[in-house]
């Protein structure tokens, strides 16, 4: 779905910008990347259409250190790489995950954090 972040086997990161009604849960899916200048498209096995995306540079890949119960609008995230980030956008979600992987990347809206295991759009965060 829109906003989902994919890491390819070549360790490049892409954020899907198209809306996709189809929901496919495939781990290690085959992904082909096509680009024309700065425009990128992904073909993902199991999804019926080519998806527009942004290539992401400087992605921070880590995991939340310990239990993760969700976020409430002002949540602070302590990562295993010793960085601390704070939620900077409204939103509440409840979950129960242990050391979920996170990707943090810069966008025109600021930094976004994608928390794996949470089926929600990436949230806006700021470094503390």
Task: Give each language-model segment a name.
Residues 1-19:
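N-terminal targeting signals for Sec/Tat export/insertion, comprising classic cleavable signal peptides
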Residues 118-128:
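Short, low-complexity, Pro/Ser/Thr/Gly-rich segments in the mature regions of secreted, periplasmic
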Residues 2-6, 40-41, 72-77, 111:
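Short aromatic-glycine-enriched beta-strand elements
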Residues 13-20, 84-92:
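Short alpha-helix capping/helix-loop boundary micro-motifs
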Residues 38-51, 109-117:
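Short, Lys/Arg- and Gly-enriched loop/turn segments at beta-strand edges
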Residues 1, 54-71:
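Structural detector for short beta-strands of small beta-barrel domains
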Residues 20-34, 90-105:
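Short nucleic-acid-contacting surface segments enriched for D/E, G, S/T with interspersed K/R
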Residues 2, 10, 26-28, 73, ...:
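Short, flexible surface segments
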């Amino acid at each position: 779905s829109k906003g989902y972040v994919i890491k390819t086997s070549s360790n490049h990161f892409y954020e899907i910008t198209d809306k996709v009604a189809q929901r496919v849960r495939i781990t290690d899916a085959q992904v082909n990347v096509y680009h024309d200048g700065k425009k990128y498209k992904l073909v993902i096995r199991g999804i019926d259409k080519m998806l527009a995306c942004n290539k992401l540079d400087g992605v921070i890949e880590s995991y939340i250190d310990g239990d993760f119960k969700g976020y409430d609008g002002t949540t602070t995230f302590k990562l295993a790489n010793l960085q601390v980030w704070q939620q900077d956008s409204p939103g509440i979600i409840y979950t129960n995950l242990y050391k979920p992987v996170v990707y943090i990347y810069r966008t025109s809206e600021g930094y976004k954090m994608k928390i794996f295991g949470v089926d929600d759009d990436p949230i806006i965060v700021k470094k503390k």
